[in-house]
Amino acid sequence: MHWIGRPNDLVGILSGKTRDKSEYLILCFHGEEGQFILPELAEDVYEENEHRSCFFGAAQVLQHAHLEGVHVVATGCTLGDKKLAEAFKHGKAESYIAPKDDVDGNASLLFVLMFMYELINNSSTKRTAFERAQAIDDETGLYQLFF
């Protein structure tokens, strides 16, 4: 678990500088219009050359992501945006899963739990685990699997 309190924390995870080796990266964020929402910091708190916006989108993912061998699951609203998914693909993610629209927070939790349960306990393929988690209800049905 990594706590993200500033843009450079997310950059460290996406770039691999502060990410432990893991097959799955679950990004639990709020999202809006296909961008991750980060805490807004006071100007004097930002580090030199740090991204200065509470929105972190496809352009920033393109700039920083090095995700070879990692499957990414993002739980925030609208993070299933095609441009964002393409940015993760460009960063060499094995796959990207996220909701295409505003999604209920409880549904996001349930989706991730069911997806991981299917992978771990039932040795399901990624596709089968995704389909079972997506099929729970209309809210979990908002999740999309890219590449």
Where are these regions (language model features)?
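Functional beta-strand-loop-alpha-helix junction segments that form "active/interaction loops"
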Residues: 1-22
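Short acidic, S/G/P-rich loop/turn micro-motifs used as interaction or catalytic elements
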Residues: 8-9, 31-35, 78-81, 103-104
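A structural signal for short, well-ordered beta-strand segments and their strand-loop junctions
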Residues: 2-3, 25-27, 73, 96-98
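Active-site microenvironments of hydrolase-like enzyme catalytic domains
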Residues: 23-43, 91-96
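Short, small-residue alpha-helix embedded
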Residues: 108-120
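Catalytic cores of nucleophile-dependent amide-cleaving enzymes
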Residues: 45-109
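A generic structural motif
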Residues: 1-6, 98-103, 131
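Caspase-like cysteine protease fold
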Residues: 43-64, 120-147
